């Protein structure tokens, strides 16, 4: 395992989940409970790794009172982080959860970063990068940051002897692939958007992933929800999934946990893919976006399809 897995989350958040008995538009809805946690895709990868004893450090822009709160939340979980100071405040995302498990989300757009702040974010990653380390670039890009941010960073990480994993969407994902990351982790919708079609069958998914692999040289790890995940890399394509039904508590953060699991272990691709699906499964079983420790029970249910 590499010395430290770095993550960079250009648009992190403080996530507040409110439990409401019911949700009525235009009325006063009273919450009977609230839960606050640090969030953002890269932050979640680092949290998952830290919870399983794997060294990871989150690099993120932090500004405003919300940024101070984000720091405190990370420190409460003993998550190692590098704060890049920015002028505008970190965003707050609100989730409203009804007893039937349905979640309604309202996400703030987040800060506008200056060119200098975006550059400082990239420089902070490179300053903490050791040879052979993984860097995970994850999530949406905040306003003010070029769509080429991940592509540029991937290239710089590669030239510095590191390995870059990309987990984003839209233009940031499409353009990010130009930086030839070592790994990309789209979900089904993101892969479909990337390859310009619908992907109704597993064969379609494998064909689309192979197309991305062929055109970019990047290994492709596709998260498929209850169908597990596929990996298209150097060797034959692989598919791992859970062999029996799993009680779903929350799908939030499952893809982030899956990516964390893949990066947490060394060994043959099939072993890493099985570990990835085990971590994703642990996340789905947990009501929070953070799964906590992955157990042998989580691993036992994963089969190579």
What are these regions (language model features)?
Residues 1-59, 245-247:
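Glycine-rich phosphate/adenosyl-contacting loop at the front of the ribokinase-like
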Residues 47, 92-96, 228-232:
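Short beta-strand scaffold segments in enzyme catalytic cores
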């Amino acid at each position: 395992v590499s010395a430290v897995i770095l993550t960079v989350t250009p648009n992190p958040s403080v996530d507040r989940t409110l439990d409401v008995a019911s949700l009525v538009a235009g009325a006063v809805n009273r919450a009977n409970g609230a839960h606050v946690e640090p969030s953002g895709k890269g932050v979640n990868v680092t949290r998952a790794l830290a919870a399983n004893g794997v060294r990871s450090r989150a690099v993120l822009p932090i500004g405003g009172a919300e940024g101070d709160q984000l720091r405190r939340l990370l420190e409460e979980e003993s998550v190692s982080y590098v704060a890049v100071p920015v002028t505008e405040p970190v965003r707050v995302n609100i989730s409203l959860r009804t007893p039937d498990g349905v979640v309604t989300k309202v996400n703030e757009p987040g800060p506008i970063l200056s060119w200098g702040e975006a550059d400082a974010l990239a420089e902070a990653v490179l300053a903490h990068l050791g040879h052979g380390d993984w860097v995970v670039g994850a999530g949406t890009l905040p306003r003010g940051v070029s769509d080429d941010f991940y592509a540029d960073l991937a290239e710089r990480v590669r030239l510095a002897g590191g390995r870059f994993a990309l987990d984003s969407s839209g233009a940031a994902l499409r353009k990010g692939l130009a930086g030839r990351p070592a790994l990309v982790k789209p979900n089904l919708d993101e892969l479909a958007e990337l390859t310009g079609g619908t992907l109704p069958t597993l064969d379609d998914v494998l064909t689309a992933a192979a197309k991305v692999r062929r055109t970019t040289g990047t290994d492709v790890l596709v998260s498929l929800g209850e169908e597990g995940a596929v990996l298209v890399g150097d060797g034959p394509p692989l598919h791992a999934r859970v062999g029996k039904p799993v009680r779903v508590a929350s799908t939030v953060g499952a893809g982030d946990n899956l990516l964390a699991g893949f990066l947490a272990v060394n060994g043959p691709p099939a072993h890493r893919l099985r570990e990835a699906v085990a971590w994703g499964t642990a996340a789905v079983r947990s009501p929070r976006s953070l799964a906590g420790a992955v157990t042998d029970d989580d691993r036992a249910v994963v089969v190579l399809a």
